[in-house]
Amino acid sequence: MTMEVDILELSDRSAKFVLSRVSMAFANGVRRAMIADVPTLAIEYVNLYDNTSVLYDEQLALRLSLIPLVTDIETYMPQAECEVCGGEGCPACEVSLTLSAEGPGTVYSRDLISSDPKIQPADPNIPIVELKKGQKLVLEAIAHMGYGRDSVKWQAGVACGYKNVPVITIENCDACGHCAAECPKGIIRVEEAGARIAEDDLIKCSLCRLCEQVCDINAIKVDFYENAFVFTMESDGSYTAKDLTINAANVIKGKAEELLAILDQL
């Protein structure tokens, strides 16, 4: 049985698609891979040379670490897995970002200067700190590749979730309209022949079954496909939504190949 993917919505930061002919365990595996197993770049160390702002050094370091960075997974690798330096830190596993600012004014993520032009803050307008007249901030930040399972700052996937594809059948409807009034999604339309749901709207059903509960004659039944899922995901900007989904699939593929290699040795 071959897996099927039907893309419903796709933008740089978000996607919605139907994943069919897979188990719930597989769908959850894709979700977990997006959140925890796709490595991203995030600031790990901060060397502060001058900080006369109102924020403590630790507060600044925390804010910097949570700024999403555009990640090039083909160029960089997690430091612990780096074959070039053995985890000591080198251009293959880390990026340097510098910042020098003087008040008055607000320091933004766009003020970080990266040693690699490809690695930039995913959003240039994230405020870091406001500097008053005479206040300064001079620092160097070191970004490492890491996994979301180790820290939230390395989570590329946000708001990743899925639900079963709904199946709704309507038979012998008396067009009372109770189901339409109760539906929180507003997808049920009542016509002279009875209630109906447009095919394009069916995917919006939240499976709450409120329509089913208020129908006195049991004309409407809500069910779902066990092997088809509506998948919704957002990226923090480290990757595009498309690239994050592909990278998550590659992670699952790599784990499966690793398992097969181990089994072949038995």
UniProtKB/Swiss-Prot annotation:
Tell me which cofactor or cofactors this protein depends on: [3Fe-4S] cluster
Entry note: cofactor? Binds 1 [3Fe-4S] cluster.
Q: Which GO terms describe its molecular function?
A: 3 iron, 4 sulfur cluster binding; DNA binding; DNA-directed RNA polymerase activity; metal ion binding; protein dimerization activity
Chief location:
cytoplasm
Root EC class: transferase
Q: Which GO terms describe its cellular component?
A: cytoplasm; DNA-directed RNA polymerase complex
What positions does the entry give for [3Fe-4S] cluster binding? Answer: 205, 208, 211
| Membership in a protein family | Belongs to the archaeal Rpo3/eukaryotic RPB3 RNA polymerase subunit family.
* NCBIfam families tied to this protein: PRK00783.1 (NF001988)
Q: What does this protein do?
A: DNA-dependent RNA polymerase (RNAP) catalyzes the transcription of DNA into RNA using the four ribonucleoside triphosphates as substrates.
**What name has this protein been given in UniProt?**
DNA-directed RNA polymerase subunit Rpo3
What organism does the record attribute this protein to?
Methanosarcina mazei (strain ATCC BAA-159 / DSM 3647 / Goe1 / Go1 / JCM 11833 / OCM 88) (Methanosarcina frisia)
Query: What gene is behind this protein?
Result: rpo3
